[in-house]
Swiss-Prot record:
Protein name (Swiss-Prot/TrEMBL): 3-phosphoshikimate 1-carboxyvinyltransferase
SUPFAM superfamilies: EPT/RTPC-like
Lineage of the species this protein comes from: Bacteria, Bacillati, Bacillota, Bacilli, Lactobacillales
E.C. code: 2.5.1.19
Matches recorded under NCBIfam families: aroA (TIGR01356)
Length: 427
């Protein structure tokens, strides 16, 4: 599509869709809890729909309306074998979490996905789940999808040292551990988003955490709950960056999740000199309104334990860095290479095509700013965050037309993205 996006400031208020990570987990926990779960604010997107449909195939009754989703929980013992392989589409979260869950069930399940998901390594979940006693098989040494899981109701508790920082791998182990007799311990390489741990407690379960060590004793029984899901800070990040880099912009993003394991971008913006403020804090739902406006920014270094707190925001942060004075260095982010696409390679290629001074590194990039960007033809590469990064970059282009191919990838996490963009341009 040709991006008919006019340069000019963004102004007004916007509410981003429900948090994608929490939405997946809310559906799963509502299904394995006993009794009714009511969810408000669930993200209605392609990825989350994959999890919802898969749970229905596992025998769970889920009713959807405009305002809420109601799940009649089956408990762990109430899940049933699906009558066909489960289609995960583009959703690595769906596959990894459901594989962990179904490792504790006594029936076989096959998972498959689209071309992008079929290139994403699943060895990271295969190894610990096999150690617990499940039979898990993928394709080749990296265990690419399709994946077959033959679980067991007699899994063994393990002590597992995580070789990489991954909330999805951690969550897969914890979902299996909830069904496993004895104490399972997980030692994280770096602290990652803790939505699974929070949700275990919300649903009446017990989990113990001290720094990077997590302990869980199973088996456990969970009880249905009422949940309200805040807006996704990873989606809000696109408006945060747009407001910071487009002169005259000032926007407020309402009801955004501010779980401390996810707010790396807020800390980063402050470090770079950006004008950002939080109001209307809700400590129960861990949400707030984020106010952000155009700012003169300076380059910085992003590395170490900051990376897991903003891993999904790094494509749009790279665009932000092109508009900051000085050098920005991103290190320790090699996980970007196994996302929906190789985000290090793709971000470097696209921003360089637009005129940015960016150098690709094994584990990140080096970006020198500030640079003026120009129009080009770009592809989303089946990656929603790449598609939205290109759309925000188009706001900076003063001449020519930006063309984005594969914009439908944005449906993965933010179906009303272009509608919200138009609203902020005409507020």
């Amino acid at each position: 599509m040709k991006l008919q996006i006019n340069a000019g400031p963004l102004k007004g208020n916007v509410t981003v869709p429900g948090d994608k990570s929490i939405s997946h987990r809310a559906l799963i926990f509502g299904s394995i809890a006993e009794g009714k779960t009511e969810i408000k604010g669930l993200l209605k997107s392609q990825d989350v729909q994959r999890t919802l449909v898969a749970l229905r195939h596992l025998g769970v009754t889920i009713e959807e309306s405009d305002q809420k989703v109601i799940i009649q929980g089956k408990g762990f013992s109430g899940l049933t074998a699906p009558d066909s392989p489960l289609d995960m589409g583009n959703s690595g979260t769906s596959l990894r979490l459901l594989a962990g869950l179904l490792s504790g069930q006594d029936f076989p399940v096959q998972f498959f996905g689209d071309a992008s998901l079929s290139q994403r390594p699943m060895d990271r979940i295969v190894i610990p789940l096999r150690e617990m006693g499940a039979r898990v098989e993928g394709q080749g040494p990296k265990h690419l999808p399709p994946i077959t899981v033959l679980g067991s109701s007699q899994l063994t508790a393990i002590n597992y040292q995580m070789p990489l920082a991954s909330a999805q791998v951690k969550s897969a182990i914890l979902l299996a551990a909830l069904q496993t007799k004895g104490q399972t311990q997980v030692f994280e390489k770096a602290v990652t988003r803790n939505h699974t741990e929070v949700m275990i407690k919300q649903f009446g379960g017990e989990i113990f955490q001290s720094g990077k060590e997590i302990r869980i004793i199973g088996p456990q029984t969970l009880k249905g709950q009422s949940l309200t899901i805040p807006g996704d800070i990873s989606s809000a990040a696109f408006w945060i960056v747009a407001a910071l880099i487009i002169p005259g912009s000032a926007i407020s993003i309402k009801n955004v999740g501010i779980n401390p394991t996810r707010t790396g971008i807020i800390d980063l913006v402050k470090k770079m000199g950006g004008a950002i403020e939080l109001t209307d804090r809700d400590d129960i739902n861990q949400s707030a309104t984020i106010h952000v406006s155009y700012s003169k920014l300076k380059g910085t270094r992003i590395a170490g334990e900051m990376i897991p707190r903003l891993i999904d925001e790094l494509p749009i942060i790279a665009l932000l860095a092109t508009q900051a004075e000085g050098t920005t260095v991103v290190q320790d982010a090699q996980e970007l290479r196994v996302k929906e696409t190789d985000r290090i390679q793709v971000v470097t290629s696209l921003l360089r095509k637009m005129g940015a001074d960016i150098e690709e590194k094994t584990d990140g990039f080096v970006i020198k700013g500030k640079t003026e960007l120009h129009s080009c033809q770009a592809d989303a590469f089946l990656d929603h965050r790449i598609g939205m990064m290109v759309a925000i970059a188009a706001l900076l282009v003063k001449t020519g037309e930006m063309i984005l191919n594969g914009e439908e990838a944005i449906q993965t996490s933010y179906p009303q993205f272009f509608k919200d963009l138009e609203s902020l341009q005409h507020d």
